[in-house]
């Protein structure tokens, strides 16, 4: 009987604690709604494309983090991971960043890129993330990226990644592919 009384008191105490917490800080009924889980996966996969925890110490949980990261700069070492995800050499990567290969090569691995280069790298990483998502795998995406596409005048999508407008054009083509429209 004492054990049952103890359990009842414990249950009442739990309810009292929950009520006190809910008055001050209302807790949502669902701890992790699907939209938040999807966003977390999106930003974590972006971090993986950029080299994971080895190159990005801070976590990415939203657009504000991307803005702050752009302003702060990212390490040169993120370029290797991104180049690998795109299936390109560092020489090609430097061309996409409108910088000479030698200038990129001179930087230390931990040296931060300037704001414009960082923004371009993040844009390319988001593009790679979207491409892998639509095409289905990293390897298939790399093959697609280097293959001539009719909608691009029989040029590979890689040829258009040196400008923001080109990236947006290729993202539109990915959207068409996702919808099943031949491009």
Region locations from a protein language model:
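Non-transmembrane "mature" sequence context
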Residues: 2-183
